[in-house]
Amino acid sequence: DLRERGLSKERVCRDISEIIAGNTILIAYNAHFDLSFLYYFLLRSGDPDILRGKDKLDLLTVYRDRRPYPHRLLNAIEAYGLGGKVRNSHRALDDVYATLAVMEAMDAEKQDLVQYVDLFGYIPKFGCPGKPIGSVTYRPQTGGRPLYEEGEIAHV
């Protein structure tokens, strides 16, 4: 039974490779964390090069530009009035549905998501989170105007 035995790491890596093959954008809420986790999983059990050349969109960066603290996914769900539509149970599938709903609400609010592709923000007092992703530009997020309009690029 799948629930008892699960899937092999190799099988999961193959499935991930098939899902993100081709011209795919990788979207997440707190994408740096998720992509780092995925990279190291693929490094041990698959091929991390499948992530190379993929566009990346971090909805946490977008949310920080649009709303005051706090910035958890739950806060975004509440801010966009999605509580009756999605759950923030911190379960993988629920998080996927919640992230998709938040992205749709963000796009309906302001159609500038393309400006955030491969642009991740970070809180200056904490610095860049972990090892930088090579294809991503990191900028300190201080508020006031959209991050994509900021001129300062972080040196990481």
Language-model-derived ranges and their functions:
Residues 55-71:
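Short alpha-helix plus adjacent loop in nuclease-associated cores
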Residues 92-102:
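Alpha-helical transmembrane segments that form the membrane-embedded catalytic/substrate-binding core
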Residues 1-45, 50-51, 74-90:
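Conserved non-catalytic scaffold segment of RNase H-like nuclease domains
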Residues 33-34, 69, 98:
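Short phosphate-engaging motifs
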Residues 100-156:
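Acidic two-metal-ion nuclease catalytic site recognized across multiple nuclease folds
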Residues 42-46, 63, 67, 80-84, ...:
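Short, well-ordered alpha-helical segments in soluble proteins
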Residues 34, 58, 95:
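Acidic active-site catalytic centers that drive phospho-/nucleotidyl reactions
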